[in-house]
Amino acid sequence: NIKYDFGAFDANLIISDRTVTDDSVTDWARIDMDDYVPAPLIVDGDKSYQETTELRLISKPGKFEWTVGYYNYKFNEEPNSVSQTQYAVDQDWLEYVMLYAAGLNPGDYDATVYCPPFCEDHLGYPYFYYGSYTEYNEQEETSFYGQFDYNVNDKLTLTFGIRDYEIEDASKSYQYGIFFMDSNGCDGNDPAGTDCAELSGSESDTRMKYAINYMVNDDLTLYATQAAGYRPGGNQAPLPPFCSSDEAAQANFSRRFNSDEAETTEFGVKARGENYSANVTYFDVDWDGIIIQVTPGCGWRYNFNGGKAETSGWEVDFTYAVNDEISLDFAGSSMTAETSIDISSLGASAGDRLPNTVETQWNLGLVYDTTIMSYPSYARLDVNYYGDSFNTFAENPNSSSPDYTKLNFNLGLDLSEYSKLQLSVDNLTDERTEAYVYAVDDTSWRPRNWMQWIPPRTVTLKYSYSF
């Protein structure tokens, strides 16, 4: 993060470079077979690189103020790398999986033909029955933006903003194994059981923003905003074989989904006092091509451009100092999220609630500032409420995330200007309640019935030092 004062304006250059690596070996039971089938799953050295560059030029305060900038984001998966492996523990279990998961006889399949990349030194060889491999997967987003503020007087400010963006991506990936015996790769010359997908795409658009801000007095501000935003589209993993007979998935799944467009209108109030502050915002969002996360009966999740939708509601945050040591804060939102059109392939009618949207959530915090062994310290207790959401437009409680409430506790000490010690307890009362329920009959040969609980009480001790 580099800042420089050029005199007439300020410049800020922000560069971020991250590498993320994920390795794991998991003992699991495939959901399309009996629970007792041993079928290890390997995430083998998944590595991705993310690079962000942003340059902002910012004017000095005055009657007319401006900010212009450049933003670039790049994502790359490790090229020519194995992403995932599933294998049986011996030949007998491999033949069991072949028969019941893919309808294959022992002589129909030979895992040794997929070398490379799955050779003798690979864990699970030669009892491999599914794997994925990335030749390349690249994404890039570039945008230029500007915001221009005109201070009409000490109370009134008018704002105009613009953002021009372009998104490009390209990928080539392979899947191998018993589920793809009718495929022979991109060029048709690979061994049977090689599924290849080569994808690329790009899109660009320009979005605008308009705003007005009026300071009634030092303690009260009113504002209104109208802006067009977007959530980036991209490519997604192919449907797994057990979704091949799912009618809903086959009707609307696509390896590529586009960016959506959100036309947002907001009206807000900011109030301040000697011992309090409050912000209240009403928002209304008209979506076009909204990205909906779909969970069909086969249990897979994917993104789908669901046409037009509308979300509207309120956001509130409030702080109140009871005295010099004790303060309260509240933040919450309540909204409705509905499709504006019929989506026959998903069984949705205009006015139905959008899947996987939490319409109500809030947090209430109590803070006590004190000293412990002469160190400035604080204790904080939070009550968190998470509203329910449903996987489908049908709002089936057997495919949903029920609402729940939990308590969190934090105790922090400022050991010096640079070092801090913090004790955190998540789910203080060790509440045991459902976080996710999935119990539906699907198009595979057996129903899927399982449940996730919210994480149990978790205690974390963290020491941080700032240089």
Feature names for model-found ranges:
Residues 1-67, 74-78, 266, 277-279:
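Outer-membrane beta-barrel domain signature, strongest for Gram-negative TonB-dependent receptors
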Residues 27-42, 82-134, 170-202, 234-256, ...:
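Solvent-exposed loop segments that connect transmembrane elements
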Residues 57-59, 69-73, 135-285, 367, ...:
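Structural signature of Gram-negative outer-membrane beta-barrels, strongest in the C-terminal barrel
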